[in-house]
């Protein structure tokens, strides 16, 4: 291993260690107040109320930003995440290139499914604590829950589903998000479409897309 490789490895390890500790320190004060104290604070401070609803917790910088822009200005700013600089996440991408890798690149970089699974879970926590695109991260979490795909089946497919389906369409049209999810290898594998055929169709995805993703259990349709 040459000196540059060693330097990069140490830098990466140092970054991950520091980032992990920083993430924990950031997450601990997010629930600093009891429900009663928080409700009282929000009642007297509408800006804090908005921050607590749109973000993962009122950080000092968030409160400064909403006071600078005003409530409407802050919401408008958060609705355009592509225009918000996010240096903490840029550093994360530099430390973990697998997060932006293609399918085949990711397979080469991370051959241990559980190791990549851990990284994806840790990354979600890190983004929640450090990203400036807080509303975007909240919406990503909502759609991730709605179009649920377990991380344990295949972490690489989950990585691509998160990036190319959920994050790409999080603030876009639901129709486009639904179609992207319907073509996601992670979703198709999870709901057994990899074993579905014309002669022996598997109805798992069809049932889930009707009951959970769109119309609901009593949505005015039958299984006939």
Predicted feature residues:
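Asp/Glu-centered strand-loop micro-motifs enriched in Gly/Pro and often flanked by an aromatic residue
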Residues: 3-6, 35-41, 61-65, 105-131, ...
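N-terminal secretory signal peptides
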Residues: 1-11, 21-30, 34-35
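Active-site-surrounding "flap" and adjacent substrate/cofactor-binding loops of secreted or lumenal enzymes
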Residues: 45, 60-115
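C-terminal segment of N-terminal export signals and the immediately downstream linker at the start
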Residues: 30-57
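Primarily short, surface-exposed interaction patches in extracytoplasmic proteins
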Residues: 61-66, 119-224
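Peripheral peptide segments
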Residues: 15-16, 109, 159
């Amino acid at each position: 291993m040459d000196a540059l490789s060693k330097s990069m490895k140490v830098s990466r390890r140092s970054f991950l260690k520091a980032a992990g500790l920083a993430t924990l320190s950031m997450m601990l004060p997010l629930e600093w107040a009891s429900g009663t104290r928080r409700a009282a604070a929000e009642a007297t401070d509408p800006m804090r109320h908005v921050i607590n609803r749109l973000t993962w917790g009122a950080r000092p910088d968030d409160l400064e930003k909403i006071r600078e822009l005003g409530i409407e200005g802050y919401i408008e700013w958060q609705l355009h995440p592509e225009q918000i600089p996010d240096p903490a996440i840029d550093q994360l991408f530099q430390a973990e290139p697998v997060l932006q890798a293609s399918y085949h690149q990711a397979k080469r970089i991370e051959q241990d499914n559980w190791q990549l699974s851990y990284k994806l879970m840790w990354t979600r926590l890190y983004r929640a604590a450090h990203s400036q695109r807080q509303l975007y991260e909240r919406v990503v979490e909502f759609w991730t829950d709605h179009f649920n795909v377990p991380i344990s089946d295949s972490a690489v497919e989950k990585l691509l589903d998160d990036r190319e389906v959920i994050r790409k369409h999080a603030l876009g049209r639901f129709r486009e998000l639904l179609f992207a999810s319907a073509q996601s290898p992670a979703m198709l594998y999870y709901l057994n479409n990899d074993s579905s055929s014309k002669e022996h169709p598997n109805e798992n995805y069809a049932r889930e897309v009707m009951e959970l993703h769109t119309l609901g259990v009593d949505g005015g349709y039958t299984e006939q």
